[in-house]
From Swiss-Prot:
This is Translation initiation factor IF-1. NCBIfam families: infA. One of the essential components for the initiation of protein synthesis. Stabilizes the binding of IF-2 and IF-3 on the 30S subunit to which N-formylmethionyl-tRNA(fMet) subsequently binds. Helps modulate mRNA selection, yielding the 30S pre-initiation complex (PIC). Upon addition of the 50S ribosomal subunit IF-1, IF-2 and IF-3 are released leaving the mature 70S translation initiation complex. Keywords: Cytoplasm, Initiation factor, Protein biosynthesis, RNA-binding, rRNA-binding. Component of the 30S ribosomal translation pre-initiation complex which assembles on the 30S ribosome in the order IF-2 and IF-3, IF-1 and N-formylmethionyl-tRNA(fMet); mRNA recruitment can occur at any time during PIC assembly. It comes from Chlorobium chlorochromatii (strain CaD3). SUPFAM superfamilies: Nucleic acid-binding proteins (SSF50249). InterPro entries: NA-bd_OB-fold, RNA-binding_domain_S1_IF1, S1_domain, TIF_IF1. Residues 1-72 form the S1-like domain.
Length: 72
């Protein structure tokens, strides 16, 4: 069984929550709960409210996601 492709979409950080989780408002108006990917955590990239980010969302659960990139 093949793994489903994840959806990549851009959004803006609305709120910083505990445990490196963030509330992200996506381009389409949806708000998702997203955690930071391992590479971003490994390189100590700071993510603050107001930052524009790229989020990966699973097609199975569109309420949760993973932050994969922070735009400069």
């Amino acid at each position: 069984m093949a793994k489903e492709e994840s959806i990549e979409i851009e959004g803006v950080i609305v709120d910083a929550l505990p445990n490196a989780q963030f509330k992200v408002k996506l381009e389409n108006g949806l708000e998702v709960l997203a955690h930071v990917s391992g590479k971003i955590r490994m390189h100590y990239i700071r993510i603050l409210p107001g930052d524009k980010v790229k989020v990966q969302i699973s097609p199975y659960d569109i309420t949760k996601g993973r932050i994969t990139y922070r735009y400069k």
